[in-house]
């Protein structure tokens, strides 16, 4: 019996023992949680930050991930196509011109109170040995009495206070958007404030470091960061904006934010990069994630990215319609002491960098996402009857009925649960409203209603079709979705006819066939049908019985240019981006007689780049000598065999082995006007980047010709520079191959410096081109090459200096006193010049 009793007692105690074990296990995990490192997949986290409303826009936005357009921030044309009917066969398209310009400056100021308290009890600060050792490692000369007492307890308390970097990272996000907008717009200038000053404290002694921790909100150890990261941190700590990348007055730098109390300390030297140019937007974006990881502030960066999507465009619309110029962000100024005494254990590590928010499509979707807030606000005003004359009047701002109705719907309340407008905003974002903007919603709705009454509606009505959910449905938008109201038993026949007409007019407004939305539901006065235009009747005839809106698509009207970040160019095999760039690489296939994309890959070269880091010297010689042969038309006629071999090789030509100089236009990159993109050049003292079409000028002796001069460096190789500059200005040479052509021309000439005009003319004829030499000193024009040359390079000689020239325009005039035309054949002229020295000794053609 005794044994049985012991077994029974043991079995009774098992649940209690199991509970004790679970409690011990939980306590152990809690005590060692600081040692655990969370791995963050950047692209997955980034996709979670995108709201449902923006995801709908991205789904319907048909553009490439990365592109560039000249003047993108000032004008971008968006095409939209609306499809109707069950089969979606009936479609209507339209074009809307948008821009990124703001309506005026406004301030996003932080909250005054800061609810930041120590995460530890005050009684355990002085017995926290781990934190004390961290302080002593940075302050080894601290005296014993100083390491204890109230002063040190205050240090411990500030170190144990949780970090809050949301305000700092919000300014970083604004800089990212402004910088990306400048890159996409191809802006080449930036502006900086005159009073930018960083609080850097190198060689800081122990006592000064402790005083800095007590007196400032953010103390960061600069030894943990690169000079670029320190500059970005300090720039974000300044008042925003302190640097303007995409001009002044766009929707991003119209926002103003106060400075943070940031100090960067170091026991040694501190180096910063004051250029404030971050390379590509991807590089800047990745740098932000790296800084957040080092400061254990990834969650703060996620908050800033999420809270700023679409908000700048939303505030631009609010500022344009109301007196709102200040908005409380509901976050305090940043606080961070985590790295004040050196490196800390990182709790989060980003294993894969994101990239969507730095793409071109990310900028466009942010603009369109911000436009949805204005569209939702107009629907709220419409569903309350502010756009008609029954509940409201032609001047809604002064009408007491609609003002009282909007107050009843909470449009001046700061709480989204009581504010009908903010509640609909949250249905679009699927996130709480984080800014204190509720008090301005009534004024905003009345202003939108007043503009609609005057005939000015939202820019793109089809943007409403991307909204995932909306409670303000008694609108023209609701009619397009098949909502005809709650129904009524009175006047059914007339009501049905009226609803059908109203629905057709609403669909026409959504398709862009009507400038302003029709007055429906509470905004409608009387029972008469609204006038329907012929385009809307045609739309109804095509759609048939089912005339409801089904879908919408967006795309760019202009042809964008390519955008490739320098990380992809410098390490194409070792560096991968989440959103790759876009190249405008085209080559001409002579067999097919058309321009095609360059797809051929040189895997041997890629392997050498991967394992050796660069091309070998032998490969570079091959690139500059063999692959640059004039394979477009071959050498002089007596080399028929090489000509045929060159043309056979041309059938599979790629951009990597294409000819450098050519007499034919070589548009490897075109702009939105389908013109060749040329690098900047200085013509008659004015900087230009305009493509110049070539036409062979007719010159006779005694004529007065006009010409302009294009500057080239006077380094002794001005003749070579003038030839290359002429080819690039006329689109005969792609911008990125200019240096390659200069090296090729210089290698094939006998004189490495101070070239003679005959050498330059022979070089031009070697490549199948002529040369026109204008001598300003003797008023002489010499035309080298055959008279029927398809292309001639124009060179101007002014004493001992050569410049490129354009005949037929410019402020320079000269009367041609002597005109000479070359009479010898090109191959004979080249051989005569070669006989004078070792000219073209390394050319593969004449070997």
From Swiss-Prot:
Q: Which domain of life is it from?
A: Viruses
Under what name is this protein listed? Uncharacterized protein p4
